[in-house]
């Protein structure tokens, strides 16, 4: 189990990313726009750099919904490998069967 503080930190990052997503997209569009003047593009770069570090989606980490484990998380299910295995063995995941050949 991950510490509660780590789970809360990740939740806070998700909220920050959602809050700044629209503004970040506008600034990035201005930066790559070849028709914009160099001054406008530079101002957009500076404004993007002044945003909080956690506003970037690259800082998000996929975590298991049950345990908060940061590694071995399956995106499709949102569960860590251990919890996914337990859920599959209990039959909680429809269509998921143990491989045998």
From Swiss-Prot:
GO molecular function, one term: structural constituent of ribosome
Entries under PANTHER family matching the protein: 30S RIBOSOMAL PROTEIN S14, SMALL RIBOSOMAL SUBUNIT PROTEIN US14M
Assembly and interaction partners: Part of the 30S ribosomal subunit. Contacts proteins S3 and S10.
Pfam families (alphabetical): Ribosomal_S14
Family, as annotated: Belongs to the universal ribosomal protein uS14 family.
A GO BP entry: translation
Organism phylogeny: Bacteria, Pseudomonadati, Pseudomonadota, Gammaproteobacteria, Pseudomonadales
Entry GO CC: cytoplasm; small ribosomal subunit
Keywords: Ribonucleoprotein, Ribosomal protein, RNA-binding, rRNA-binding
Protein known as: Small ribosomal subunit protein uS14
Keyword RNA-binding annotated: yes
Function: Binds 16S rRNA, required for the assembly of 30S particles and may also be responsible for determining the conformation of the 16S rRNA at the A site.
